[in-house]
UniProtKB/Swiss-Prot annotation:
Reaction it catalyzes: beta-L-arabinopyranose = L-ribulose
Role this protein plays: Catalyzes the conversion of L-arabinose to L-ribulose.
A Pfam match: Arabinose_Iso_C
Gene: araA
Major enzyme class: isomerase
Entry keyword set: Arabinose catabolism, Carbohydrate metabolism, Isomerase, Manganese, Metal-binding
Name the UniProt record assigns to this protein: L-arabinose isomerase
Gene Ontology terms: biological process: L-arabinose catabolic process to xylulose 5-phosphate
Keyword Metal-binding: yes
Cofactor note: Binds 1 Mn(2+) ion per subunit.
Cofactor: Mn(2+)
Entry's EC annotation: 5.3.1.4
Residue sites binding Mn(2+) per the record: 306, 331, 348, 447
């Protein structure tokens, strides 16, 4: 995958000087035990680093300032081991510009009824501290995540891990750079939008390039480079020659290999991690990039067709959040309306993300009726089954809106021998009629990002962090 820089999360444990040095040393020792256990659990995608105990306002403020300017720190996890007066937290919490998780837990899972005394009560009063601390976060409208339960339980660790992925994506949002090869498809409405507002609100940089800029990179690709990549294709996929001669078929595939090399080189040279294409802007290109785009999506680059920069950026963001697992660009195509079998067939003219493949992809070559270019190569496969979320972003003039529809994807049971593109099928929730109606009434686009790895809660958490209006259909 197109990798992130290494990230870590700081663990800030709240207490106060009132309890005395002996008690504070015990708090710190228990905090270290929790930190070590969480890091050794194997359940968390990023490491936790324990910081000094938060026992006064200056200390809290300084650690939050440091979080902001340390790029490797993706967020803060707090735990109120004892009562920690929340006025101490106001300044630092207001300054904090990264995601915050309040872990409402305590060191002991159970109350030791046989030995409990006031010393134990004073040392272990998270129930007391949680409410004081929770109030100030609510008062500050911090949009922090709250995870409740014993820190050693797998369910609690799962929730922390999912939040970590959201926090990592939030940080990456300010590094999303989209290269647009050509403009939006002419006369299409929903794919357009305010790029300046997107950069202000989400941190996304969106740059236009004429297709000739990419053609220069394509022309510079060496045959030896194509040979190496073609050999990789042979090891990774089945080859379906169809009605083409082997020479003609391989010539088409080699064109796509040159595109993959050129696009990747262009993106990496400019620091871009997402891109768009447009079949109306292909001057100097022999084919519409298909296989090339699919391969790059599989490596973690965000993508959307027809110049749809919002979906390309969202694709990159959700790939980071999901570790590029079963997440990719998609388009609503065709309804299945038979009673009891209602579903939506998802595909695209070429560019369906191979992270969604349930079968070994095959490379095929087939004519493309639009774009007026040579027959392009593409990967064909059937999509995975599983519960997931479908996400679309649209610009409503006064604000962006994110639509989130829960779906159940299933593997097709009927062959489609004449369909020369990958296909994904899903049922929308709560049911076909209400789900589709809600999507249309709320202005959901035909371009989406689907993930069979992420949850609604994760996508909503990101939306809250960036102040993004959202609708959940489930």
């Amino acid at each position: 995958m197109l990798t992130l820089k290494e990230k870590e999360f700081w663990f800030v444990v709240g207490s106060q000087q009132l309890y005395g040095e002996e008690a504070l040393q015990e708090v710190k020792a228990q905090a270290q035990t929790v930190t070590d256990a969480l890091n050794e659990s194997g359940a968390l995608p990023y490491p936790i680093v324990l910081k000094d105990l938060a026992i006064n306002a200056d200390q809290i403020t300084n650690v939050m300032k440091e979080v902001n300017y340390r790029d490797e720190v993706a967020g803060v996890i707090t735990w109120m081991h004892t009562f920690s007066p929340a006025k101490m937290w106001i300044r630092g919490t207001k300054l904090l510009q990264k995601p915050l998780l309040h872990l409402a837990t305590q060191f002991n899972e159970s109350i030791p009824w046989d030995t409990i005394d006031m010393d134990f009560m004073n040392l272990n009063q998270s129930a007391h501290g949680d409410r004081e601390y929770g109030f100030i976060n609510a008062r500050l409208n911090k949009q922090n995540k709250v995870v409740v339960g014993y820190w050693g339980k797998s369910e609690v660790q799962r929730q922390i891990a999912e939040w970590m992925d959201v926090a990592a994506a939030y940080n990456e949002s300010f590094n999303v750079k989209v290269a647009r090869f050509g403009d939006n498809m002419r006369n299409v409405a929903v794919t357009d939008g305010d790029k300046i507002e997107a950069q202000i609100q989400f941190g996304w940089t969106v740059d236009y390039f004429a297709i000739g800029d990419l053609v220069q990179y394509v022309n510079a690709v060496k045959e030896e480079e194509i040979d190496v990549l073609f050999a990789e294709y042979k090891d990774s996929y089945d080859f379906d020659y169809g009605d083409y001669s082997k020479d003609d078929w391989e010539a088409s595939v080699r064109v796509q290999a040159s595109y993959e090399i050129a696009i990747k080189r262009f993106l990496d040279d400019g620091g871009y991690n997402a891109f768009t294409s447009n079949f109306e802007d292909l001057y100097g290109m022999k084919q519409l990039p298909g296989l090339a785009v699919q391969r790059l999506m599989g490596q973690g680059y965000g993508f959307a067709g027809e110049g749809d920069w919002k979906t390309a950026a969202l694709d990159r963001l959700l790939k980071v959040m999901s570790h590029n697992q079963s997440t990719g660009f998609m388009e609503d195509y065709t309804y299945e309306l038979a009673e009891g079998k209602e579903a939506i067939l998802q595909s695209h003219m070429l560019e369906v993300d191979p992270t969604l493949a349930s079968t070994k992809p095959k490379i095929t070559v087939f004519p493309l009726g639009i774009g007026d270019r040579e027959d392009p190569a593409r990967l064909v496969f059937d999509g995975k089954a599983g519960d997931g979320v479908v996400v679309s972003m649209a610009d409503f003039g006064t604000h962006f809106k994110l639509l989130i529809n829960e779906v159940n994807a299933f593997e097709p049971t009927t062959p489609a021998p004449n369909l020369p593109v990958a296909r994904v099928l899903w049922e929308v929730k709560p049911n076909f009629q209400d789900g589709v109606k809600a999507w249309i009434e709320n202005g959901g686009g035909h371009h989406t990002v689907v993930s069979l790895n992420l949850t609604t809660d994760q996508v909503v958490s990101y939306a809250k962090l960036v102040g993004l209006d959202y609708i959940v259909i489930k």
